Amino acid sequence: VSSHDLAQMRPRRFTANGPLKGRIRVPGDKSISHRSIMLGALAVGETRVTGLLEGEDVLSTAAAMRAMGATITRDDSGMWHVHGVGVGGLLQPQQALDMGNSGTSTRLLMGLVASHPITATFVGDASLSKRPMGRVIDPLSTMGAEFTASPGGRLPLTLRGLSPAVPIEYRLPVASAQVKSAVLLAGLNTPGVTTVIEPIPTRDHSERMLRGFGAELTVDVAADGARIIKVRGEAELKPQDIVVPGDPSSAAFFVVAALLVEGSDLVVENVGLNPTRAALFDVLRLMGGSIEELDRRDVGGEPVADLRVRHSLLTGIDVDPAVVPSMVDEFPILFVAAALAKGRTVTTGLEELRVKESDRISAMRAALELAGATVTETEDGLIIDGTGGDPLPGTAEGTSVVTHLDHRIAMSLAIAGIASKRGVEVDDTRPIATSFPVFESLLESARA
């Protein structure tokens, strides 16, 4: 960390401050927000989006789609208006597309560009530039796109799309919704049928939303349980009015906070409960968490409910590795819940966490240990021996946990802090803005 970066860092000590009460609403779902902008930009006509997550990642997507010809504006009521260019209508961007910290923007937009006759350069921040893009480069190269990447298949990279691209049948070697989505999006402007075979189901927002925008998309389940997803290319997408449900990954922090802090009784409104995303809530219920669904409803093809969460004594469990793809981003906050549970929680099958915004396995072990938790790191997970419901000791004066520019680690340790005796010092709260700009103010209002 350079001294210049140190001057910019925003440390904060998060401390206990009473129970969480009342009703809160978390910002819109990040996955759905990204895809609303991208698909709206490929439709012909005006797509209107209410409840868009206005975090830095989604704004990176909006800036990139503008650079490729879409008109995207936000009105005073907070509604976003996207005037699309049509599938096949993307224009060559005049400058490099800056992806900031957003792996989702990068991988999905690479898919879009791959089947258009344009060349685009993708750049990102220090954290994103360490993340592997090879898993997307491989299938898109097979479709005919050409790549000049930094060593290890990383950013900055330049992609020259091919139109017409070659339709492929691609079996995912690793469970990744981003790789699946990149290939399906490339398939939109590719003649014929593009097929993705997914051995383990991952989040399915792309499939739901592509269908919602009018793409011809089918999903079949093979004898071995794999999902076979086909999209017919040269599609015409129709503009949509989209109401973005609350992000379950953001709701997760408040759900765990209310479970851990004595006396809490909190309603988190309008939470998206897509089954490929909401496994954390099932795991917390298995641990004994009181999480009740109120007013379950369907919004734009996505299941939504209000969650009433009450303080509960949790019990450690062995987490079934089969749920990993449905809660891959929620393990950092699950580790915090486990640290205050009664008994031992064992997690396995988490190799994917080592290549997220940071190595989330080792970063969470180090951070939780500083906060006084008992944690053992394994090759593919953590083993956590909980306090039995007592608050964590917290970090010593002058000691702060290292967030590695990772928003989920910063927010997870903030929640550990409000469930600790002396608080937890977080070295830098700036990364939180990538996914949840109002996190800190919402935390204050829930404890008011």
Where are these regions (language model features)?
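Structural preference for solvent-exposed beta-strand-turn elements
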Residues: 1-448
